[in-house]
Design a protein with these regions (language model features):
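Juxtamembrane membrane-water interface segments that cap and precede transmembrane helices
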Residues: 23-30, 185-208, 221-225
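Perimembrane helix-loop-helix junctions
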Residues: 137-162
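Transmembrane-helix signature of polytopic, membrane-embedded enzymes
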Residues: 59-77
């Protein structure tokens, strides 16, 4: 006997989920834009990042059935966490990280894919121009190449280094032209600045609320995937295991350097969105339907709280 579809199942399989989510998100952005000036550049980056998530889902078949939950989850979480206090730096870093994922999986099981590796890590290099601390992810990304994309070799290792450095060739020219070599030196000094570890003096209630909710989604999505991933192809499992590893790394880095919670939070959302989308798409039953509805209500309430209630520094 066919099981009756729940609200969760209908949303997950609907072709209208992404258009409706995009419309609602746009209305929220426009409403906030009437109150807060200069948010449209960030809105444009969020829209482009969402399109990249659509492409990431399509190209890598993240869902073994039709579903737009990856891009819907990403857009909903970015709208919730980003408004009304937007960060252009965070928006750019987030888009670059998605672009990295989109490119690096072309290297799957190909240890001679120096070209794709170069382009993927050039995206990380671009992100590091404005957020040098993303360099802390480099060892983890190399582990990813060894264990998950199975593309690590001496050639691809050096290709990743060259890709990371290339944006600085152009940036160095700019700093020389403007006679601001000290600015370039200060940029790299931030990479080894450990004086602000565990500095929670500027963390706000909004940031803690957003992080707690996204972490909850990460845990739910990760546990569900680990328990039920046997139905997926090996390549798909590798991709999701990468999401789990990078989510854990992002949370650890946020705990260590909470002053970078916006930039790291964007990276966390990129990795969490597919995990919770997998949960929404492939779970059945009344309990998971109720869980989905509760998570949806929590997201709306947190979004309303972020927009309507002024931020408060906790310490």
């Amino acid at each position: 006997m066919l099981r009756k579809k729940t609200f969760q199942n209908k949303v997950a399989a609907s072709r209208y989920s992404l258009p409706i989510t995009a419309t609602l998100a746009t209305l929220v952005w426009v409403a906030v834009g009437l109150l807060v000036s200069n948010i449209w550049v960030e809105f444009a980056f969020t829209a482009m990042s969402t399109l990249l998530m659509v492409e990431l889902n399509n190209r890598n078949a993240l869902m073994r059935t039709y579903s737009r939950m990856v891009s819907c989850s990403f857009l909903a979480l970015m709208t919730m966490a980003g408004l009304p206090h937007l960060s252009l730096k965070s928006s750019i870093v987030t888009m670059c990280f998605i672009a990295f994922y989109l490119i690096i999986w072309n290297c799957y099981q190909d240890k001679r894919s120096t070209g794709w590796t170069f382009y993927a890590f050039a995206c990380i290099g671009l992100a590091s121009l404005i957020f040098v601390q993303i360099g802390y992810f480099m060892p983890i990304l190399w582990i990813m190449m060894m264990v998950f994309t199975l593309s690590f070799s001496v050639k691809t290792f050096f290709a990743s280094l060259v890709g990371l450095i290339v944006p600085y060739w152009f940036a160095a020219g700019y700093f020389f032209y403007t006679d601001n070599i000290q600015g370039l030196a200060d940029h790299f000094c931030e990479f080894i600045n450990y004086s602000e570890l565990f500095d929670y003096s500027q963390v706000t209630d909004h940031q803690i609320l957003n992080l707690s909710f996204v972490t909850l989604l990460t845990i739910i999505g990760s546990i569900h995937f680990i328990r039920t991933s046997y139905g997926d192809k090996i390549r798909t499992r590798m991709i999701y295991e990468t999401f789990i590893m990078l989510s854990a790394a992002s949370i650890i880095f946020i705990i260590l350097q909470p002053q970078h919670i916006q930039e790291l939070g964007g990276i966390l959302i990129v990795n969490t969105a597919p995990l919770i989308a997998y949960f929404i798409t492939f779970t059945r039953g009344k309990f998971t339907n109720i869980t989905f509805i509760l998570l949806l209500i929590m997201l709306v309430l947190i979004m309303a709280y972020n927009i309507l209630v002024p931020e408060t520094i906790l310490l």
